[in-house]
Swiss-Prot record:
Role noted for this protein: Binds the lower part of the 30S subunit head. Binds mRNA in the 70S ribosome, positioning it for translation.
Gene name of the encoded protein: rpsC
Organism lineage string: Bacteria, Pseudomonadati, Pseudomonadota, Gammaproteobacteria, Alteromonadales
HAMAP family the record matches: Ribosomal_uS3_B
Name this protein carries in UniProt: Small ribosomal subunit protein uS3
Annotated family: Belongs to the universal ribosomal protein uS3 family.
Amino acid sequence: MGQKVHPNGIRLGISRPWNATWYANTNEFADNLHSDFQVRKFLNKELRNASVSRIVIDRPAKSVRVTIHTARPGVVIGKKGEDVEKLRKQVSKLTGAPAQINISEVRKPELDSQLVADNIAGQLERRVMFRRAMKRAVQNAIRLGAKGIKVEVSGRLGGAEIARTEWYREGRVPLHTLRADIDYSTSEANTTYGIIGVKVWIFRGEVLGGLPTEEKPAPKRGKNRK
């Protein structure tokens, strides 16, 4: 039976960057890794309603720089920047180093696999039919320019006695092509019948030379003006 490698792990350093970029001595590595885990856990808990896509952590010159990619930057920043200042103090306390927090807005949340997976999980928790939630997510992604998308949900779908897996795909999702920009994420929906797992793969185009390739617009038809 064929098994699938993790789409993000196999592309690290090729077409996908790391979520933490820092170097450390052998003595400090474990402490830094643990503080990274604590920071991510804290931020995901505090910002669970802020549509956070991913959290990138840098450690320049004995300080910590956290970049939060979110579709709702206003929720993270708060009134006059009060909320982000509280987060900065807490992150500095967790890491034991001066902290800086940057906010990066996700312009198209429909093309971000983590936000799509969280959205589907939220709909399942609100008792929306799983097929409707899946189909809506697929249609939105294709409409906004995705080359392909696959959505998979597994668990006691619709309250069934026996757990099963259902998936829906549209377009191309080439998992073996390393230059393919595949965005993969998972989420969980806590329903009254148990946990339902959600997986999302989004193919956003091919990456050449470290940057996503952009399709040139077709030339407009008409008379040439001299």
